[in-house]
Every structure is written in C-alpha cells, then in structure tokens.
Amino acid sequence: MNAPPTFESFLLYEGEKKIIKELDTKVTNAAIFTINKEDHTLGNMIRNQLLKDPNVLFAGYKVPHPLEHKFVIRIQTTADYSPQEAFMNAITDLLAELSLFEERFKDAIKEKKEGGD
C-alpha cells in the first residue's frame, strides 16, 4: 500500500515544526500558515473562527494531498491587523469556546446521571 505509517499522522519528526508561517507576496497583509500533523477537523474549525473576525478579509484552507498530514491556511486581514494576530486570536477564542463546550457537556452528563432519565 502507498499509505504512510499511522504514527506519521501525529508524531512530529525531530526538527519538524508544528506551524510554519510565510508571507504571501501576491496579496497585501496576507500570510500562509502550514500546520503539520493535523487535518480538515482543525483546519475547518480555525477557518470558521477566523471568518467571525471583522478584521479578517479572507480565510481559506486546503489539504495539499490526502496522504500528507498537514493543511495550509491563507489569511488576509485589514491594514491595521496582522494575519499572525488574527491567527493567534482565532486559536485563543477557539480554545475558550471548546473549554466552555467541555464544561457544558460534563454538566449535561452529570445532570443526566443524577436525574436518572
């Protein structure tokens, strides 16, 4: 089979970076971030979070190849807001939302167990 070993989907090799940033020279105030060892799940979540930000003009992602465990996200922002700032804010907001979701989920499970329904 051509499929890479399973561990390659989540283990970073020695010297491999989780996130690589490069400036987009074709568009002003834009950057391209490559996130290694992740897939559509995180890519779509980050893109959706970025699109909630009014200072983000464009946010899109792609997985270059189905056998490569990485995605590339392109972000363009307004002149007074950097793509890196937008990326960091989106991740921070996403972590807060997921934390709230986890808390509510645990509360719902606890309530269900106590209620006996």
UniProtKB/Swiss-Prot annotation:
Nucleus recorded as keyword: yes
Entry keyword set: DNA-directed RNA polymerase, Nucleus, Transcription
Record-level GO BP terms: transcription by RNA polymerase II
Gene Ontology CC terms: RNA polymerase II, core complex
Subcellular location, principal: nucleus
GO terms for MF: DNA binding; DNA-directed RNA polymerase activity; protein dimerization activity
CDD domains: RNAP_II_RPB11
Location in or out of the cell: Nucleus
InterPro entries with a match to the protein in the record: RBP11, RBP11-like, RBP11-like_dimer, RNA_pol_Rpb11_13-16kDa_CS, Rpo11-like
Family the UniProt entry places it in: Belongs to the archaeal Rpo11/eukaryotic RPB11/RPC19 RNA polymerase subunit family.
Listed name of the protein: DNA-directed RNA polymerase II subunit RPB11
Annotated source species: Drosophila melanogaster (Fruit fly)
Gene field: Polr2J
